[in-house]
Amino acid sequence: MPTMAEVARRAGVSVSTVSHVVNRTRFVSPEKAQLINDAIAAMGYQPNELARSLKVASTNSVGLAISAISNPYFTDIICAVEAECARLGLMVFLSDTQEDPDRELQVVRAFHQRRVDGVILAPSGSPERAIAYLADKKLPCVLIDRFADDRFDQIGVENETAMRALIDHVASFGHRRIGYIAGQPGLATTRERVDAFHASLAANGLECLPHYVSPENVDTASATASTHAILSLPAPPTALVTGNNMTTIGAVRAIREKGLSIPRDLSLVGFDDFEWADCFEPRLTLVEQPCTEIGRQAATLLSERIASSHAPPRAVRLKATLQARESCARPVNRRSI
């Protein structure tokens, strides 16, 4: 365990300055405080007085760690968390972990060092170390969107029900060859949606062909490449389902690069309705997730967890809504698109 003196050396300040920042006993310039807090987070320094007492004075602040702020899906969630926390009298510290497990661990450590009352976390694909740290420090936490650990309160959508609605919709047009472009590897939501895709096909009496499924796509570019590969098969699917908004964009790009028309040549549906989905031609059929409600309830759950740390963890699943638009039509039998 690093010492306060080692933190001081790394930050290039005196031990007393580090002590003032840790104990909040004297004003320290923001520049020096940032150097010290960065050193504390990087070294994993744990103040002895905090370790001796789990009950420190409330700071009326919470940390919000988002795995990819650039993803439009999280915009409404962030706004709702901040609005509800403001109503509850809580300040929100926001950080982007950039889907990086190392940065994720650094962020939750920094939140703890700043003595936030709790954390709302949208986990990365490999959140084990960050979650273990939160559990070890007994820091109240709510996981959003990605169900990763049953030791914490969690909130997300009913992925199985939403996928069933998508497949039922596509099958109602007569499609029997349906492909799937899944989302990021390692995420519980990705696994749930892949499993639900298989189950929903079976429920409709349809066969799931392995070469019609791209189970892991890290970004829009990989979704574009996966869509190209599936559409180049000798007997490609007549409809595609996408696992999130990024894979939807990648699929649309590949379809257009192939010179194909939606839905004349290929039907397309997917997860994550987004604000400019109406700007596509045709307008896309997508599952709308209740992002505002996810954010609001996440803040409420955390506030209740802070007030009652011994209550059993809760898992909340919210219903998503199918927004049926114009991107589905009856299938056209094609070979080697």
Q: Which role does the model predict for each range below?
A:
Residues 68-71, 98-99, 125, 183-188:
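Short histidine/acidic/glycine/proline-rich micro-motifs that form metal-
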Residues 1, 15, 42, 80-88, ...:
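Bacterial carbohydrate/catabolite-sensing allosteric modules
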Residues 6, 24, 100, 158-159, ...:
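Acidic/polar helix N-cap motif
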Residues 1-60, 73:
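N-terminal helix-turn-helix DNA-binding module of bacterial transcription factors
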Residues 15-20, 54-70, 169, 177-184:
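Short beta-strand segments enriched in small/hydrophobic residues
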Residues 45-118, 195-198, 209:
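Amphipathic helical "hinge" segments at domain boundaries
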Residues 28, 73-74, 103, 151, ...:
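Secondary-structure boundary/capping motif
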Residues 98-101, 122-127, 246:
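Short beta->alpha connector loops
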